[in-house]
Amino acid sequence: MFNKVSASLCDLIGKDYVNAVLDARAALGEDISEASAAANEVIDFFPESAQNKDNDMLSIVGKQIVKPFVNSVDGAGTGSFQKALHKNSAPVTGIGSYRIGEDGKVYLIGKSEHYHTPMGHRFSGYKLIDNARKVGIVNATHNNTRGYITRLCEQELIKAVNKGNIASDKSLSSVINLETGSLAVEAGIKMMLTRFYRLDSSFDAPVYSGRIPVFFVMADSIGGKTANYHGTTVVAQTFRGMWPELYESIESNELYKVVSIKINDIEDFKSKMKRYNTGKYKTAGFLHEIILMNYGGIRLTPEFLRSAYELCEQYDTPELVDEIQSCMWYKGMFLFKLYGLKPDFVVVGKGFPGGEYPASKILISQRMDSLNQFGALVTNGQEELASLSYLITMRFMEENGEYVESLANDFHNKLTSVGKNYPALVSKVEGEGHLVCVHFYNL
């Protein structure tokens, strides 16, 4: 069983702020009796009854338990989105680790909910979001008026990510709230580029002005670039081999270069680091996931990454760890901390807001904080209730990291055993903990 976590809104974000909201509503002439009750209601984040129900429902996965919701609404998606649509399994509702599809069947959510529901559907802890609305906390803010909850969330993230570290200019010290992982990664790429190009005419000449920035990414099995996935912005897509003619023009005009590194091959990393830090070239950054979930769940080893980071420090090359998919699935909330890594950028999202809001963020070291405000911002990036969802998820995980780790290890070990029982079908099981992929010889 998970450790019991219970809190009211006042417990989670502080009585002083909640009272300020209530006082403001009273000053507007509103009755605050219901709001006051909501502010002090203690919510059990994951009751024992909910945990038991989650376990019991496993036996009915795949079964139809209610009549299908038959409808002719197919949406108006683009050709590719419509081709990929399986509306029969789209959720009518969900609870815990399951959803009920439009076909009336019970589905185990798994990868279908794409990493962003580690707490499952309708997690009780998120009732505090409903209570925040009852209290009168508004969601919409602006970059120049980031609300109290968002500022508190930023501070709690920095505290959590630096826990146990010695302060330095490599310490993660600031946060940009950017809604989507694609924009969060792009912000990191922009900050890497500010060492080569001016963001605008008000900036001084960059430290590596005149040299060609070289970005390191992970290679696929044949040495190409398709294994790395860092979102859908144009620049990030050129990093993985998309827009080939555009990238060819970029490289031939020496604007930047993308170099792929063989998976877990430190000698390849070392030779390319030396090669691209001579003459006209300079390494601009090393971008990586830890579990390549868009490429067979291949895991980068701690030994490879630690050695790669040592080389990055030697050659003044910032590191960006993309934890959009892996965050919140491991003890301590960040997988890179379990590896003992100290990156300049950490991109998080999906798991932190638990599927309640799009709320990705990039955490930045002091030495790489180089953009002006309009260098990377999103109008809706600092929504207050989205930040509250972060704080709720973080509170639960802070109390349950050890148990989550034990579940992850048990799951991985048992899945590996299943693979060994079918050696003619399964070539290997890749990944770590909850993020795993089964490799078959053929499909």
Task: Locate the predicted segments by residue.
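PLP-dependent aspartate aminotransferase-fold enzymes
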Residues: M1-D23, H116-D130, E156-H288, P302-E303
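N-terminal glycine-rich, Lys/His-bearing helix-loop that initiates the first secondary-structure elements
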Residues: M1-L172, D268
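Active-site nucleophile and cofactor-binding loops and adjacent substrate-binding regions
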Residues: T141-R151, S174-V185, Q325, V348-P353, ...
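Active-site core of PLP-dependent enzymes with the aminotransferase class I/II
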Residues: S271, I291-Y315, G375
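Conserved PLP phosphate-binding loop immediately N-terminal to the Schiff-base lysine helix
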Residues: E289-T301, T317-Y339
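Active-site PLP attachment segment
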Residues: G340-L371, Q382-S389
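Structural signature of PLP-dependent enzymes
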Residues: T393-T416, K428
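Conserved PLP-binding catalytic core of the aspartate aminotransferase-like
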Residues: A408-H412, Y422-L443
